[in-house]
């Protein structure tokens, strides 16, 4: 019996670790773990704001295999910044994510939430509309748009 414990708040690393462990046991190749994007960018957000984060993020293009730059990683980073009241930095991260993953309703929803937190109503409406177009069955998005006075 193998027991895997994890203290990462999202919990899915246990599943990934379990799959990787099984692959190793069966002689299959395993991808190397990538570094957490937030560990790199949050200190820059705190010390240099959006310009420092942007420069580091753009530099990652050549080193993307070292850092997890997935849609989920960017969204998680954006919400971490939002919870830290670093709204301009969160908006920048969500914008990068929307640019990299334009077909994701979740990304546009998150960007709308950040704009809304910043009092940018029109931008929030635009983002929520885009999210609603991509996920037309999402009643929550329709409710938010109605709340914002747009339908």
What is the role of each PLM region?
Residues 73, 107, 140-141:
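TPR alpha-solenoid repeat register
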Residues 1-58, 75:
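Catalytic loop of the DD-peptidase/beta-lactamase superfamily, centered on the K-T-G motif
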């Amino acid at each position: 019996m193998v027991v895997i414990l994890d203290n990462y708040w999202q919990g899915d690393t246990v599943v990934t670790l379990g799959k990787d462990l099984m692959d190793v046991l069966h002689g299959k190749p395993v991808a190397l773990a990538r570094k957490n994007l937030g560990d790199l960018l949050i200190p820059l957000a705190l010390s240099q704001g959006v310009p420092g984060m942007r420069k580091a993020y753009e530099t990652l293009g050549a080193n993307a295999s070292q850092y997890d730059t997935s849609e989920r990683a960017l969204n998680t980073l954006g919400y971490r910044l939002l919870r830290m009241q670093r709204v301009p930095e969160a908006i920048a991260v969500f914008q990068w994510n929307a640019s990299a993953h334009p077909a994701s309703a979740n990304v546009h929803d998150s960007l709308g939430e950040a704009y809304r937190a910043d009092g940018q109503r029109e931008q929030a409406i635009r983002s929520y509309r885009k999210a609603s177009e991509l996920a037309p069955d999402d009643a929550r998005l329709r409710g938010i748009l109605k709340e914002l006075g747009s339908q």
